[in-house]
Amino acid sequence: MSVEKVLSLIQENEVKFVDLRFTDTKGKEQHISIPAHQIDADFFEEGKMFDGSSVAGWKGINESDMVMMPDASSAVLDPFTEDATLNIRCDILEPATMQGYDRDPRSIAKRAEDFMRSTGVADTVLIGPEPEFFLFDDVKFATDMSGSFFKIDDVEAAWNTGSDYEEGNKGHRPGVKGGYFPVAPVDSSQDIRSAMCLVMEEMGLVVEAHHHEATAGQNEIATRFNTLTTKADEIQIYKYVVHNVAHAFGKTATFMPKPLVGDNGSGMHVHQSLAKDGVNLFAGDKYGGLSEMALYYIGGIIKHARAINAFANPSTNSYKRLVPGFEAPVMLAYSARNRSASIRIPVVPSPKARRIEVRFGDPAANPYLCFASMLMAGLDGIKNKIHPGEAMDKDLYDLPAEESAEIPTVAYSLKDALAELDADREFLTAGGVFSDDFIDSYIELKSQDVERVNMTTHPVEFELYYSV
């Protein structure tokens, strides 16, 4: 969408406010609203100054001025606001140079795509993520010096089979790990997901399907692939819609990977492929219908997977999902169709749809950083011809201990992932896509999460140790 079309859109829809949005390092959208009468063509050249020191992991107070530069092509009407509002996504620029800030996730994603094109390997990367999420009726949590707790409740939860409800307990709910694909009334979220899909399409996403997932309250909405930065933008819209539609239905939504103990967590599988001049570069005559380039791309992902974990699985909670027994792919292997492998080659109707699916990521990830790090790892694999070895077509969840010990795994904790990122960063800094400054600041920021969790007394510790 051009600047002229944006200005026309404002007039035609009697827009009252323009909401400028950007994504911080942790992956959370931030925003500032401006009266629409302040917006003209010059605004898209000059941007909006703001205080970058207020964003975690960004500027110090002594050099805090930054520029939000609106991207006219991202403009979309907000369906949730009472007054007509136009949302526009922004890049964050350094005011001295008017270049992308090296800690701005969206600028990093754009640099990754630019770097890919500069190598001559491909001109397009297509990304198709599958974020899962939970819908609950009630969530309470607190942490202070006197204690800590969390308490989740939902009508679908197995623990409510004996609960009393004012309107009566209807009894239809999924069992533990038993929620995949049942129709209503076991699936109680059909209408909510349908409403989410309609709003997503209103905001420009192309919805392909929606369904209940394996766990009580767990859902998935599948949307069509897109180019890397645009798809990351769409994931932010996806999350915004899920949160706000859930709220309107009296529910609460979360993209936290593992809120429930003893049941499956939420993943974000990321389908991806490279193309050049409209030709899918991943289609070929090698294993699974892949090209040699695609195999090298897989090799790069596997080699750098534990560093990628720092972006694809960026929470301490992520690693409560990445454990055996809950359908989470922890082994760094690839296979056609085999969902126990961390990289799968899906069955496709034609070679032009050939792609790989990286399965270890989760929806807590900042999409810009997650997708960019995977692309950079894949490009490194292509550059250095890193072959992934033999495919693993057997059930990796059921291997003998001695055999599984020979297969590399994802990182076991956020602390481990950050250490791997620190040691294995050259593939990210190629072409100046990720800077050492950003990686250092990211490690420092996420290490604060690790330290806080490690320093907080846990209720299970009372269970284990109070009577020693």
Swiss-Prot record:
Belongs to the glutamine synthetase family. The keyword Endoplasmic reticulum does not apply. Binds 2 Mg(2+) ions per subunit. GO terms for molecular function: ATP binding; glutamine synthetase activity; metal ion binding. Mg(2+) 2 binds at E132, E213, E220. This is Glutamine synthetase. Catalyzes the ATP-dependent biosynthesis of glutamine from glutamate and ammonia. Its cofactor is Mg(2+). The keyword Ribosomal protein does not apply. The lineage of its organism: Bacteria, Pseudomonadati, Pseudomonadota, Gammaproteobacteria, Vibrionales. Oligomer of 12 subunits arranged in the form of two hexameric ring.
